[in-house]
UniProtKB/Swiss-Prot annotation:
Binds 1 zinc ion per subunit. Its main location: membrane. Substrate binds at G338, A339, M340, E341, N342. Keywords: Aminopeptidase, Cell membrane, Glycoprotein, GPI-anchor, Hydrolase, Lipoprotein, Membrane, Metal-binding, Metalloprotease, Protease, Signal, Zinc. Residues 1-15 form the signal peptide. It comes from Heliothis virescens. Binds to the B.thuringiensis toxin, CryIA(C). PANTHER family: AMINOPEPTIDASE, PROTEASE M1 ZINC METALLOPROTEASE. A lipid is attached at D987 (GPI-anchor amidated aspartate). Residues 16-52, 988-1009 form a propeptide. GO terms for cellular component: cytoplasm; extracellular space; plasma membrane; side of membrane. It is a lipid-anchor; GPI-anchor. The lineage of its organism: Eukaryota, Metazoa, Ecdysozoa, Arthropoda, Hexapoda. This is Membrane alanyl aminopeptidase. InterPro entries: Aminopeptidase_N-like_N, Aminopeptidase_N-like_N_sf, ERAP1-like_C_dom, M1_APN-typ, Peptidase_M1, Peptidase_M1_aminopeptidases, Peptidase_M1_dom, Peptidase_M4/M1_CTD_sf.
Length: 1009
């Protein structure tokens, strides 16, 4: 082992001394992709490491004892100058095997004043010991073992007194402040919780893993004048034995995991819905200033409808899950998680729950609806049936994300089935295209940090996409039957993926839904091919239009190289249709392929376009031979465009952008295909285009091709913007309004005169005459007024932010204030972000700071100057200094800027301030360097198209007939993208890369040694 370390260290030293040439930088997944994403998204940092040879994690609790019941008293001192919580927990537990002499549970950041183990009334002498590195409390018997009986468990009780200061980091039991109305001078404090994934151990000693389910009886002691809420209905309330307090006792919970508990102590008001007996079944609670202004009405209506719809869909009524359950939706002023599915007490940021018809735009309206749906779906997928461990978190979050869209679509007309394509399928295909992407089922997750990393785009978005693919494989009714059986069989238990697979397979077999796929089709292996291995395939389709023979080669897609060297085969459901008889309605697969090369008979001969993956139900990309691409382009530019499903047009846009980025296709070819956007007016293709163009435009800043590309985008968007116009029309469909909300800011960024002038005029109408800007136009109107204005415009909007009572409007303002380039105004904003002054909330620091950097192209330098002048103040505001610095690194535009930034990082004072974060922060600058170098490899191809325009493609005609595919086929030659030659690095850059190499080498050593 020592010899290996010495050898590697010697190699590393040799690299530094010799300044050996660095291989061309081919990494094209860049830092800013971690920063681009909507609310409630979990954007991967592409830093997950595939784990193998997994051993039991030292962070996992032993299963030698298990709890059955907790009795908890929480004492919440939210009204005191020093805010604390304390209490007592009595855990009923038993041994699961003989010769157990130690009980191991979780406890962290608490003072324990008493730890007593009893069997009945007999005290068992023990020695408690803390093991803080694993958050463990070890209670060792001084003599003998716990009694064990396999047939009749011998019960013990472990009683622990605890106390802790109220947290302020939005984990465990923490404090939050609010004003009933913005001009209220009286700041009010409340206590609330966030336990997922590993923070229940901050609130009380417990078995803080999802697999240790138990029942809970809870009493909350609170100050007089406050109210409390818990997961279940209140059993009773009365004076405490301690003066100035009252105690609320709650009914027993269902059998549940610790991370799903929650409590609130506040002076909130409720908007209730009761049954005939007057019992509250569903309520929304929030600060009185929001409830009294009607901001809870929308969530109350939609929440009840979603709960009823999900109860019907699952065949398992929510209120039948346990007689003590009710549904409370709570708006929390400070809430880092966004929303949380605590069983019966769901918690949300205000912006994700409270709706005001005059001041909440369509974006936040749909967020409120679909986050309600996500959390309500968890009552079944996550709460009733829980992932056995966080390595299969997709069993919880994949289904919640799936129903976030489709459950909402059954209740509200918000275009969510369409938007699933852009927001879930396309987003997860990108995250999953890195060689570092983790599989959905990811053994080896142990530490709290590793658990946190599982809350990723792959887990949420890919999980939901694979579930959708499987639903189309089985059919909706069969899929629902299988899910109902899964929930029924595993209610109040934990689940592994095989439990889901067998339930769905059984339903499929009983209904005959799997017979069409042949006797060799193994449903479990199909599902495992998508959950147990990372990545996804690109299908390379070559069509002989004279014979109808289609040769399909699958390769794992790699965003950096096109085809991954880590090739894998997936079991892929295939659908396709042709121009001979186009049909995009039947999404049931016609073929299942699992081999590297497969031949399929198209069924017709002749020059007909062919499109695979109908409605993009499958989780894969499709690349065609050049001739077939030409036929598709002709169709998209002509009358056949309307025959091709909107989702498939969006699929083509997204695929083509990623093929060009990875080198599977030139940008000249890609833009030829994308030229059909000139005639496109639908939502999904244009949102896919916006995403692709924004990514490319960010990399072309300072390049001559940027202005030419901008002109082309304006040209192509003239038809859709001509139909939409810049102002909403009364009664228009939601998706038209939402497309305008997406496109209008882009038009202003492209300096379209109608947009810039319109924004200025609308803003002045607000500032001078008080006429409100239409809610769906405020994002682009505010931003462009600030870009074109100065201190006057900034002060007007900042005062509006400070005084507004609707949090969704405050967020829109916070997201646009950074558009100012006025230095003093920008510095005012930055100071209020990083100074604890109850002006901007900690949960919004990252949003506000990122907007300050990215809201205006000139701001990167201004914000970096501010950071350098206020280093400690900025670093203190964030959990990690990497957060604010990553925003700077992502927007450096030239090699000179990167080198200047790296030189600053390498100063002794900055390295000392960054500490252990230095390596990651320096690595961010290297990622940006790679981005700059990558652009040089595509400039010629881009320029060729922008200069010459579209290729001329001549249509051809032929007759239709059927033909059988040949019985054998020669595997086609796959053209690999060439590795581009990048500019040589400067000495400074070479030293930087050498340093990064050593950092990476150290990480590898840590893993393998």
């Amino acid at each position: 082992m020592a010899a290996i370390k010495l050898l590697v260290l010697s190699l590393a030293c040799a690299c530094v001394i010799a300044h050996s040439p660095i291989p061309p930088a081919s990494r094209t997944i860049f830092l800013d992709e971690r920063l681009e994403g909507g609310a409630f998204e979990n954007i991967d940092a592409f830093e997950n490491i595939e784990l193998s040879n997994v051993v039991a994690s030292p962070y996992r609790l032993p299963t030698t004892t298990v709890p059955t019941h907790y009795k908890i008293l929480w004492i919440i001192d939210i009204h005191q100058p020093v805010q604390t919580y304390s209490g007592n927990v009595v855990i009923t537990l038993h041994a699961t095997q003989a010769q157990v002499n130690e009980i191991v549970i979780h406890s962290d950041h608490m003072t324990l004043s008493s730890v007593v183990l009893r069997q009945g009334d007999t005290v068992i002498p023990t020695t408690p010991t803390a093991q803080p590195e694993y958050h463990f409390l070890r209670v060792k018997l001084n003599d003998g073992y716990l009694a064990y009986n396999a047939d009749n468990a011998v019960l013990y009780t472990l009683s622990i007194d605890f106390t802790a200061p109220m947290r302020d980091d939005m984990y465990g039991i923490y404090n939050s402040w609010y004003r009933n109305l913005p001009d209220d001078a009286n700041v009010r404090w409340m206590a609330t919780t966030q336990f997922q994934a590993t923070a229940a151990r901050y609130a009380f000693p417990c078995y803080d893993e999802p697999g240790f389910k138990a029942k809970f009886d809870v009493t909350i002691r609170r100050p007089v004048g406050y109210s409390s809420w818990f997961c279940t209905r209140q059993k009773g309330s009365g004076p405490s034995t301690v003066a100035g307090y009252e105690e609320d006792e709650y009914h027993t919970t269902p059998t549940m995991s610790t991370y799903l508990l929650a409590l609130i102590v506040s002076e909130y008001t409720s908007l209730p819905a009761t049954n005939a007996a007057g019992e509250i079944l569903h309520e929304v609670i929030a600060r009185p200033g929001a409830i009294n202004n009607g901001q809870a009405v929308y969530a109350q209506r939609v929440g009840q409808a979603l709960l009823a719809e999900m109860s019907d869909h699952t065949g398992f009524d929510f209120y039948a899950q346990d007689p003590n359950l009710k549904m409370t939706q709570a708006a929390i002023p400070d809430f880092g998680a966004g929303a949380m599915e605590n069983w019966g007490l769901l918690t949300y940021r205000e912006a994700y729950l409270l709706y005001d018809e005059q001041h909440t735009n369509s974006y936040f309206k749909q967020i409120i609806a679909y986050i309600l749906s996500h959390e309500i779906a968890h009552m079944w997928f996550g709460n009733l049936v829980t992932n056995a461990w966080w390595d299969v978190l997709w069993l919880n979050e994949g289904f919640a994300r799936y129903y976030q869209y489709f459950l909402t679509a059954w209740v509200e007309d918000l275009g969510l089935a369409t938007r699933f394509i852009n927001e879930q399928v396309h987003a997860s295909l990108l995250s999953d295209s890195s060689i570092y992407a983790h599989p959905l089922t990811n053994p080896g997750v142990g530490s709290p940090a590793a658990v946190s990393a599982m809350f990723s785009t792959v887990t949420y978005n890919k999980g939901a996409s694979i579930i959708r693919m499987t639903e189309h494989l089985l059919g909706f009714d069969v899929h629902r039957t299988g899910l109902r059986n899964y929930l029924k069989d595993l209610a109040y238990k934990t689940a592994q993926p095989i439990d889901l697979f067998t339930a769905l397979e059984s339903a499929g077999n009983q209904a005959g839904a799997l017979s069409a796929y042949g006797s060799d089709f193994d449903f479990v292996k199909y599902y495992e091919s998508w959950t147990e291995q990372p990545g996804h395939p690109v299908l390379n389709v070559q069509i002989n239009h004279q014979t109808g023979q289609m040769t399909i080669t699958q390769r794992r897609f790699d965003i950096d190289t096109g085809h991954s060297v880590q090739n894998r085969n997936y079991i892929i459901p295939i659908t396709f249709t042709t121009g001979a008889n186009p049909s995009f309605d039947n999404t049931k697969p016609s073929h299942i392929i699992s081999k590297g090369v497969t031949v399929i008979d198209r069924g017709v001969v002749g020059d007909y376009w062919t499109i695979f993956n109908i409605q993009q139900t499958g989780f894969y990309r499709v690349n065609y031979d050049d001739y077939t691409w030409n036929l598709i382009v002709l169709a998209l530019r002509g009358a056949d465009r309307e025959k091709i499903h909107e989702y498939n047009r969006a699929q083509i846009v997204n695929d083509v952008f990623q093929f060009a980025r990875s080198g599977l296709m030139t940008y000249q070819r890609a833009l030829n295909i994308l030229s059909f956007l000139e005639f496109e007016t639908e939502y999904a293709p244009w949102v896919a285009a916006i995403t692709g163009f924004n990514w490319l435009r960010n990399r072309l800043v300072g390049k001559p091709q940027l202005d030419e590309l901008n002109e082309k985008i304006v040209q192509w968007s003239s038809k859709v913007m001509g139909e939409l116009t810049y102002m909403p029309t009364e009664g228009e469909p939601f998706m038209r309004s939402y497309l305008r909300w997406q496109l209008a800011p882009v038009m202003c960024n492209l300096n379209v005169p109608a947009c810039r002038a319109g924004a200025r005029a609308i803003f002045e109408d607000l500032r001078v005459f008080g006429h409100e800007v239409p809610v769906d136009s405020r994002n682009w109107v505010y931003c462009n007024a600030l870009r074109d204005g100065g201190a006057q415009e900034f002060n007007f909007l900042y005062n509006r932010f400070k005084s507004h009572n609707v949090y969704t409007e405050k967020i829109v303002l916070l997201q646009t204030l950074g558009c100012t380039s006025h230095v003093e105004s920008l510095n005012t904003l930055l100071t209020d972000i990083v100074t604890p002054n109850q002006m901007i909330r900690p949960q919004d620091y990252t949003t506000a700071f990122n907007t300050a950097v990215s809201g205006n192209e000139v701001n990167t330098r201004l914000v970096w100057n501010y950071i350098q002048a206020n280093l400690q103040l900025v670093f203190n505001a964030f959990a990690s200094p990497r957060t604010p610095l990553s925003y700077i690194a992502a927007r450096l535009r030239t090699v000179e800027e990167v080198v200047e930034y790296q030189t600053w990082l390498n100063t002794t004072a900055i390295q000392s301030a960054l500490g252990t974060n230095y390596n990651a922060i320096y690595g961010d600058s290297v990622a940006t360097y790679n981005s700059i170098l990558w652009v040089s490899t595509i400039e010629d191809s881009l320029s060729t198209y922008l200069t010459n325009g579209n290729d001329v493609i001549e249509p051809s005609t032929s007759t239709t007939s059927t033909t059988a595919a040949p019985t054998t086929v020669t595997q086609p030659t796959i053209t690999e993208p060439s590795t581009p030659t990048l500019p040589e690095l400067t000495d400074s850059a070479m030293t930087s890369f050498a340093s990064l190499f050593i950092i990476s080498l150290g990480a590898i050593l840590h893993l393998i040694l």
